[in-house]
């Protein structure tokens, strides 16, 4: 397995020490790519530095293209980790708190060029790999049915990770699952907000209901972010500045990046609808197995499983709602976007499968503490 990428807010290492003495641009050409991009994101005077060295941007982009070749053509594990770690840092600029100095670089031209290079190459690679074709004359109902077939027939529906969590995993392994699940779960409110931007009027009621449920239906303590944070506190994980993204391998980072790519690029908005639909369809049955496993190892007495219990029940409704009230009317209005929705669905199924397989292997490799085996 590739080295895990630490997507920290501050890059580290000798080259970064040089950068602190003024050699930021030079350091960015020698650091591992994810550290280089994190360093640039944190450089508040990046515009001025790049303006003073007009040839530097092309050198950085050449380096990015080289890393992309290794990652997407050669499927080099470390290069995949570098690319997705860099992309994660770039997307963090779009959701970071406005008081953070790095927020000034949200639309930095050089960083935007890097992001667009990675996005185009990744989408092109995934498009060739998945080869999703839209029907010649799509209508909303047929696309909704196609998504349900894709979901029900995909191997990820019965992924062995969740059988393992239900029947065999130790408490330590289940807690490691929670930690790995953190970055996306704690970001999901923002992702739903992105889905509401520019939404068709027919879809707004369903999207608003999803957001209302995510926000706790008026009770802040029941918001999904707070429910999940309560779970982390009870099991001793607690909060982290990066929402524990530092534990993710490239597969986990790619799953997060998949959402963000479709969120921040209006041209890919309809891919987001397919990604979201699959997420709502997958969660209930898998989370039911997870909750069974949690209770098997003694969790649940402090209400800490409410986050997953909630998704077992409401995501059944949300899954049908996404298909019937969001995707169906939108495809009926604009049949040409059916291909993007189907691609998003297939893409999410594939990324979940890869992430679950990598996480399953990592959990199996954890040492089981004495007395923790089921």
List PLM regions with ranges.
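Non-heme di-metal
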Residues: 2-374
